[in-house]
C-alpha cells in the first residue's frame, strides 16, 4: 500500500503488501465464463506508473515482452492475486451484471497484524 498510495490518513496505509481475493457470483453472459480480469506479469514500480497514467502500458508491455493471462471464472470460482501486479478489469460484455465479492488483505513483514477489508 505504501509503495503507490499517496494518501496516509487511512488504516491500510501502514502495510507494505496487499493481495485480493475475488469470488465470482454471476457472469455477465450466462453461457460464457467471460474474462473477469487480465493479470500482467509485471509488478507496479515508479518506472511503470507513467505508462499506466498515460494509457501506454499495453505498448510498454509489448516492447518489454511482458506476459499476461486472462482470468475466466464460473460462478463459485475464487482466485487470489497480488494487487501490485498490473491488472485490468475488462468492461462487462453480456446482458447481466457481473457480480463478484472482493476481499483485500494488507500485511507487512514487520507488523504482527494483518488487515482485511471488503
Where are these regions (language model features)?
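Catalytic core of non-heme Fe(II) oxygenases with the double-stranded beta-helix
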Residues: 1-69
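Catalytic core of Fe(II)/2-oxoglutarate
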Residues: 50-118
Amino acid at each position: 500500500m505504501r509503495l503507490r498510495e499517496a494518501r496516509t490518513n487511512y488504516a491500510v496505509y501502514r502495510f507494505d503488501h496487499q493481495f485480493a481475493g475475488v469470488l465470482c457470483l454471476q457472469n455477465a453472459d450466462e453461457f460464457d465464463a467471460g474474462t473477469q480480469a487480465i493479470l500482467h506479469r509485471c509488478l507496479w514500480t515508479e518506472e511503470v506508473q507513467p505508462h499506466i497514467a498515460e494509457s501506454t502500458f499495453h505498448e510498454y508491455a509489448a516492447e518489454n515482452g511482458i506476459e499476461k493471462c486472462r482470468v475466466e471464472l464460473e460462478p463459485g470460482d475464487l482466485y487470489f492475486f497480488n494487487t501490485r501486479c498490473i491488472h485490468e478489469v475488462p468492461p462487462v460484455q453480456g446482458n447481466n451484471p457481473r457480480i463478484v465479492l472482493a476481499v483485500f488483505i494488507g500485511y507487512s513483514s514487520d507488523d504482527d497484524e494483518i488487515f482485511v477489508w471488503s
